[in-house]
Amino acid sequence: NAIRKRLSAVKGGRFAQWCAPAHVEAVVLSDILGDPLDMIASGPAAPDHTTCVQAVEIAKKYSLQLSETAWELLNRETPKQLTNVSTQIIGSVRELCLAAAQAARELGYEPVMLTDHLDCQAKEAGRFLGNIVRTHAADGKKLAFIAGGETVVRVVGNGLGGRNQELALSASECISGIANACVLSIGSDGTDGPTDAAGGYVDGDTVRELAENNLTVSGVLARNDAYHALKAVNGLIITGPTGTNVNDVAIALVG
């Protein structure tokens, strides 16, 4: 971002700078956890917190082959203060989680907001949600545990999948055999990894259904092949592109 902002005429607060003294009303759709205005779309209407020194150091560290003009631009500072901008965030992962909570209420579930800053390994998040389900399966309540954010996957195999599919599949062992529970995880943009799926869905029967297809959760995860495994048990969620992106949401239902 530090480099990108300096090679652009509008990023890093320069759009708002060009507009001055006119007032800018920035309406922001955030796809970054924590909603840092200077990073969302590289902050065209936000003061830039990076410096020329950082940009040059990054370029040198990675031995970037840049033109003389580009090097000159890296040494031009971006706006650090903007007095002509008002900003309103109209969509974010927090709003996504709140919408999921409202939908859960309408379906008769009591929503439990776990976090809107989920940023761990997908497998860890899946097991975490699955264990929460197992803990509350006998409570006699209809609960919806909601977590928003964006997990990561450590790719070691040559399979096909995405972080949301891997999260869901990782939860399946924890909820195996529980009749009144499920876990789903989806990307708000309708895509998950290099696949046509938005995410995945598992329930108490998923592990058994995988076994009937000669598949195990551990084996599938070792190959990073959640897509084909979930496809075999009708666990893919396919929405098509939604035209927006406010990160991911994972939901565990019990009761």
Q: Language model features by range: what are they?
A:
Residues N1-S63, G235:
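A glycine/threonine-rich phosphate-anchoring loop and its flanking beta-alpha core
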Residues A2-L7, I32, T151-V153, G187-D192, ...:
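Acidic, glycine-rich active-site loops and adjacent beta-strand->loop/helix elements
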Residues S8-A9, A16-A22, D31-L33, D38-I40, ...:
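Solvent-exposed alpha-helices and their adjacent loops that cap or buttress functional pockets
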Residues P47-F128, I132, A137:
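Accessory alpha-helical/coil subdomains and C-terminal extensions
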Residues D48-S63, G157-V183:
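Gly/Ser/Thr-rich active-site loops/lids in small-molecule metabolic enzymes
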Residues A122-I132, V153-L167, G193-Y201:
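Short glycine/threonine-rich loop-to-helix capping motif typified by GTGT followed
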Residues L169-G255:
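Internal helix-turn-beta structural module
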